Amino acid sequence: MTLKELEIGKSAVIRQVGGEGALRQHFLDMGMIPGAEVTVVKLAPMGDPMEVQVHGYELTLRLAEADQIEIEPIGQRSRSHVGVDRARDPDHPGLGESGKYHSKAGEHPLPDGTILTYALVGNQNCGKTTLFNQLTGSKQHVGNFPGVTVDRKSGVIRGYPDTEVTDLPGIYSMSPFSSEEIVSRNFVLQDKPKAIINIVDATNIERNLYLTMQLLEMGIPMVVALNMMDELVGNQGSIDINAMESMLGVPVVPISAAKNEGVDELIRHAIHVAKYQEPPLKQDFCDRDDHGGAVHRCIHAVVHLIEDHAEQAGLPVRFAATKAIEGDPLILEQLALDVNEQEMLEHIVRQMETERGLDRSAAIADMRFDFIERLCEQTVIKPRESRERIRSEKIDRILTGRHTAIPCFIGIMVLVFYLTFNVIGKWLQTLLAMGIDKLSALTDSALTGMGVNPVIHSLVIDGIFTGVGSVLSFLPVIVTLFFFLSLMEDSGYIARVAFVMDKLLRKIGLSGKSIVPMLIGFGCTVPAVMATRTLTSERDRKMTILLTPFMSCTAKLPIYSFFVSVFFPGKGGLIMAGLYLLGILVGILAALLYKDTLFRGEPIPFVMELPNYRLPSIKNVAQLLWEKAKDFLQRAFSVILIATVVVWFLQSFDLHLNMVSDSADSMLAMVAGVLVPLFAPLGLGDWRICTALLSGFMAKESVVATLEVLFGGSIAALLSPLAAASLLVFSLLYTPCIAAVASVRRELGGKWAVGLALWQCLIAWVAAFVTHGIGLLL
């Protein structure tokens, strides 16, 4: 019997994990090992993928992968070491006891002035970035779905100028399964930080400790931060910190990163282990009596076999040994074993497999989880079921229910657009626009009264105020949209959207995980492109990158809002929703084309953790809104200001630098006139529109600024509603801004970036041409 056949609510014991390669290793690292107990929680609304519970946390996988996992059903779900009724262990005694958890014998003090470098390592969605912000005072983006951090970020620990801590992407093990996991592993192995801060989710401790064990094998000074201890204790759970420290051989500090509790103690221990280079006291977790000691003998034999090669390659010997046994190709390549040594390694491993009754990868994973189980039996009292889990299950009955998930998603998105463009955002935009107009009128009167030179007067009023001011008025709309997206992300809902939409996305050649970068793309294409690093398949990653620009970013909102308010008043929500849906539809058509041409093959397996729902943090939401508002203002007073001044200059002077009374005689008209024949079939045969669209390549917001400068507020009289509709469609689909193209170049290379820009311009031209043609027929 396979996991695919197990009924919802039923439990079973895993007997064998099929498949091969990185995916199988990832399943093992996530706890899907022979002997583990697994329970089917539910199926996605479309029947695939499925959600299962293993080692106390929720994991999603497709039915095709579940069909490769052989199981043996059990009558009743076990409750091993859950809700044990015994006296509560004493709380962690005091904060930062001087040297209590440190081994003086292992000290090797670094010279004064040495920069203490730290790697902040942990599972996805365990609170790493929140802790990083507390340690450094930084304001990195925080979310409640796996894969928020996709690149490493560094900062100095507050109060300790000779330190540098690097926030690495979340990983489940040191086996490279995706590009962000490779980033994390390479940093630890190659950059060789002075110490590791391993952050562990105390509410999901079994899975998190799997990575901890691999980090300990590396022999690097380390401190373990047990995060979310407030949630564990609040649910009547506890951890014997001192006993856990004794069994792991490193300092263990209970913290709540979100509340900044225990962070000072964590810093003191981290400084100590790095300054005095105290290695972990324990690296050997295999029991010589476990299953006849087969794994124990294998690991120690391989350690002796590869010891000299590991030292030459700069690899921790114990870590290299377990990875060599697992068959990690990157580690084996670095070890550079000769033919005889390779044969000896293979003989040792095969003998272990025969004695243990498991293949090499499963045997190593089982050894780690066996130690974790013993550790938790002795040190952890877990609540039967947390309030957060109970709450999540109740919410999921509606938001991921078979008949309610899709309607809920559509309803939520419609509500977001309605409130953004018709209610909250529109009201705030009107207020800000009135304020800018009043300030512009006051400035105009002041400059006139002072007798300022007409050229300067025109620059300030017709250039800066008309251009930059028109863009600034759309700030409330952008902030409002980001507010709602932040709520969805911070609550954990976006991860559910990926679960719900996986089967649908698979029909166009993508995985459900691709929904996360594409949803981020509605905010900004640049972080959306970076977020594709969480995808483990190069095929899926490239395909998703090429599709994210079709998700209309907030930088285009000023264009939509401007034309909708001028040409289609009272229909803002409808027009906006139509534009967003059109972008999604064109993206789907492009995906179907890519699927059968550039990216043949199957999408990656869908393996993802579903976090508990959490109440959005007011601090996190406010911080994100401030960052987005600040970024918008910086662009408005840098790129857009410069573009506005340049456009004003070029449309105000001719080639001889004489000021012109008619902008049709200006330098700008001459340059943009070259493009007029290209845009004429779209109903956009005006050099001023061509200029505005060109300026949009620098920043999409500058399209409105340029139009305001060139048309001088008379655009409604000079353009027809049909031309406005054509322009809206072209603006929706043509090449993203230069920052987005640069991010594509960074991820895929220059040829892909140029190709994407030209391809989107072609699609935009065709779509606008069709729009204009249909309009003429109506």
Predicted segments, located by residue:
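Juxtamembrane inter-helical linkers in multi-pass membrane proteins
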Residues: M434, K438-L442, A495-T525, R600-L624, ...
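Extended, low-charge hydrophobic alpha-helical regions
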Residues: E355, A362-D366, K382, V423-I464, ...
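Conserved C-terminal guanine-recognition region of P-loop GTPase G domains, centered on the G4
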Residues: Y160, R185-V252, I559
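Hydrophobic core segments of alpha-helical transmembrane domains in multi-pass membrane transport
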Residues: C408-L419, L481-S486, V564-V566, L579-L593, ...
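Conserved G1/Walker A P-loop phosphate-binding module
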Residues: D91-S173
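Canonical P-loop GTPase G-domain recognition
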Residues: L232-F285
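Extended helical scaffolds that flank P-loop GTPase cores
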Residues: G249, Y276, K282-V452, M659-L668
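Transmembrane helix-loop junctions at the membrane interface of multipass transporters and ion channels
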Residues: F550, T554-A577, A739-G749, V770-L778
